[in-house]
A protein has these predicted regions:
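Beta-rich carbohydrate-recognition modules and glycan-binding surfaces
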Residues: 2-296
């Protein structure tokens, strides 16, 4: 009986079949690194210091942290939160006003920093005081057998924090739009919203939307609803979409990675948020899920 059953199984065996493409399986049940294996730039750019130099640096940091703590106490005693969001009024969050210290609020990263490509970028102030994000995209992959696609440059804001290195967030609850005043080169850039992650599986969550620039000498006023941002994890757009949690924003990034090799240039005046009371859209994407018990 068993021999006959085996023969029948061989008769019904499928040949020349193609399996579904699947992503590599996870080797762990948890994420041990917030950067998914990519090192922080400070991990290998920090210069070696002596014990005396570290003591001096720690003393200067202590003075700055005490000043931050004093400002926090003042704000808590004033108890003056934003109670009314005026329609049409833009609350500027990041502004390039010609002060070189504004560049310290941004971190530049390229594929060259992680030995994944040859692109490079800079962020500097223009003679008029605005910020200029420029560089060269190189889409030729390195011949190391590891990467097939390359060519990206990115800038990201430094995560807000309180005194003594306590984490903080940008509370944009009540705002409906992201406002930018930029002057581009005709390329398409990607805006990335980074949210505070509570669990390790959420460390690679991002919300994106495209930034279309016209090029030319004129400034461009960009108004993007938060409901237009789509959700992704590890660079893959997810089936289940939801609007970003506007009370948990920890950073904003701008990425140049449109696949076109050559120089790029994006001039930024300011980035802010606005409340539009006439806008009531919750999400621009389908939120319906079939009522199937095994739907994931």
């Amino acid at each position: 009986m068993s021999t006959r059953l085996i023969r029948l199984l061989h008769l019904y065996k499928k040949t020349n079949s193609r399996s579904f493409y699947t992503t590599p399986k996870l080797s762990d049940m948890f994420e041990y690194d917030k950067k998914s294996g990519y090192p922080f730039k400070s991990d290998y750019l920090e210069e070696p210091k002596t014990v005396l130099e570290r003591i001096r640096e720690g003393y200067s940091q202590l003075k700055h942290e005490l000043w931050l703590f004093k400002e926090e106490v003042k704000d808590s005693l004033h108890m003056d939160p934003i109670m009314i969001l005026r329609p049409g009024e833009v609350d500027v969050v990041w502004k390039f006003d010609g002060n070189p210290e504004t560049l310290d609020n941004w971190v530049i990263s390229t594929d060259r920093d992680y030995h994944d490509g040859r692109s490079y970028a800079t962020l500097e102030l223009t003679p008029s005081g605005s910020g200029l994000f420029s560089g060269v995209l190189d889409t030729v992959a390195l011949k190391d057998g590891k990467k097939r696609q390359t060519g990206y440059c990115n800038i990201k804001t430094v995560e807000p924090r309180k005194s003594f290195y306590r984490s903080d967030v940008h509370d944009w609850n009540g705002y409906t739009h992201l406002i930018m005043r930029v002057r581009g080169d005709g390329r398409t850039y990607m805006i990335n919203l980074h949210l505070k992650a509570f669990f390790d599986v959420m460390w690679t969550d991002l919300h994106h939307f495209a930034l279309y620039t016209r090029g030319g000498p004129y400034w461009q006023y960009v108004k993007i609803p938060f409901s237009k941002f789509f959700f992704s994890n590890r660079g893959r757009i997810q089936d289940r979409q939801f609007s970003p949690r506007r009370n948990s924003v920890v950073g904003l990034g701008i990425t140049a990675a449109d696949g076109i090799a050559g120089p790029f240039s994006l001039e930024i005046d300011f980035i802010g948020v606005e409340c539009d009371e006439t806008f009531a859209e919750e999400s621009a994407y389908e939120l319906y899920h079939p009522p199937h018990p095994y739907y994931v």
